[in-house]
């Protein structure tokens, strides 16, 4: 159960970060409303707060979180940007998730 909660927290954190960066992108590159900066700032603040909830040493959390971020970003590419990821994208995201699992869930003496 710990593992499921950890991965779910990583996914929610990644979504908060991606949304917080995607909304300013829409404003800057697609001429959307500057009001998008308000939910973007809220989303990035949520992202920073969520990072404090992760149950391990900060460096380990950031390294493992990177693997989940890669997976969520590829999923975002597919669902939001409507671009079908390549097999290489899926392979890379799978390798990143494997790395995350090793970093977060490997047995440790301390």
From Swiss-Prot:
Stretches of the chain forming a coiled coil according to its record: none
Family according to the record: Belongs to the UPF0060 family.
Membrane-protein topology: Multi-pass membrane protein
Keywords linked to the UniProt accession: Cell inner membrane, Cell membrane, Membrane, Transmembrane, Transmembrane helix
Protein known as: UPF0060 membrane protein Mfla_2554
Subcellular location: Cell inner membrane
Domain of life: Bacteria
Keyword Ribonucleoprotein assigned: no
Species assigned in the record: Methylobacillus flagellatus (strain ATCC 51484 / DSM 6875 / VKM B-1610 / KT)
GO cellular-component term (any): plasma membrane
Pfam families membership: UPF0060 (PF02694)
Matches recorded under HAMAP family: UPF0060
Membrane-spanning segments: 7-27, 33-53, 61-81, 83-103
Keyword Transmembrane carried by entry: yes
């Amino acid at each position: 159960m710990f593992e499921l909660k950890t991965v779910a927290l990583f996914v929610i954190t990644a979504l908060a970060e991606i949304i917080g960066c995607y909304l300013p992108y829409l404003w800057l590159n697609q001429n959307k409303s500057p009001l998008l900066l308000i939910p973007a700032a809220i989303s990035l603040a949520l992202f920073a707060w969520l990072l404090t909830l992760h149950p391990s040493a900060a460096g380990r959390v950031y390294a493992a979180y990177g693997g989940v971020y890669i997976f969520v970003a590829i999923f975002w590419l597919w669902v939001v940007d409507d671009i079908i990821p390549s097999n290489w994208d899926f392979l890379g995201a799978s390798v990143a998730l494997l790395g995350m699992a090793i970093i977060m869930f490997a047995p440790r003496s301390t």
